[in-house]
């Protein structure tokens, strides 16, 4: 059985084709308003599994990703216990989930999650290992504890990964790498050949951005230079060591200025920002309350505009969601006690399209690059080249203009990794968190009218999610 999409447009060439996708049902659709593109990738998600599955699990997190058009994500290491390669201890929070599944480390647990839980997850995922043991910032992790999970690359083999879910990055996300272990962590990154993902924010007090809004709320503020200090420190480390540093969720004009200068110098620096820093400033706290509380905090309107400018001029290499599920009960605790973060996988494309494309700052094609090919390059993934797939596997449409081609994904081998997303770039829709596939609902974007929606997600040539001709 197949889903046949007539007259769908290829994202980067404009070629109109027919696309046949293996499916559970037979259906033929007029796809003249649709676009086929490489699947989105997100190098910054928190799925809370193990240890906090009341917030999110691998099952619900991957379902949310597929719904948002994502085909690959990178799991951050602030699981409970932490993803540090160290054997878990019976009695510590989350340990029973790991031990009861028959494993003794979180890396092993997530490496074999599908087999242990008898599920098939609809999204590919890689793992990010902690920079410090227990993510406590006191002692660097031992490379020997996780070196066996590194990807094995073979330029002559399209199936580049020998592991299903390899460790591809190092981070203490949620915290910056501490000064005490900074040199050792950079040594570990260099030895392993990975890259460092840095949470570029360090502060001991404060809950929201320091400024008029924090004073109006009577809440301790976080100065913007708490971000800049980490950015400048790690730029200097990149200059000294040659290690690739990737800065997460950059949010201030002064940090973007420092990153621009480092890139102009040719240093191995990349950075991301998130949809919320593009769409919201700290004034959103007055409307959305703790649903707009995150770390780094939402900054000033001037910083929001600077973030958009950094996306437009190429300083920002990619967009990542920092998908961070929490319960609404936790978010109701008030500004001082509510946890930081929001979910974002299921509305990221629409929010970014509304602000960046509809706002005239970038093109449709550039947004797809920022959410697909650019993060794939960071994570070392081979993205599907749709034109190459057409050249190798397509046929002429029978009885039609012989210039029109039909691509039957059923003929494309799995090793070609045809991971794709079907988009309606012009569809207007309303964000409704109650319809999300995530277990969480903590988003300030509920009720927003956005433009552009993922309609179907394809992994390895197979349809894993579709809302085509459906209510969802």
Q: What label would you give each PLM region?
A:
Residues 141-319:
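Histidine/acidic residue-rich metal-binding segments in metalloenzymes
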Residues 216-244, 312-313, 318, 325-420:
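His/Asp/Glu-enriched, well-ordered alpha-helical/loop segment
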Residues 103-123, 187-198, 347-351:
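Alpha-helix-loop-beta-strand connector modules within alpha/beta enzyme cores
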Residues 334-337, 392-469:
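C-terminal cap of metal-dependent C-N hydrolases
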Residues 8, 33, 44, 65, ...:
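Divalent metal-coordination and catalytic microenvironments
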Residues 1-30:
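N-terminal metal-binding scaffold of metallo-dependent hydrolase/deaminase domains
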Residues 43-56, 126-140, 174, 218-225:
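Active-site mouth loops of central-metabolism enzymes
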Residues 34-120:
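Metal-associated gating/positioning segment near the N- to mid-region
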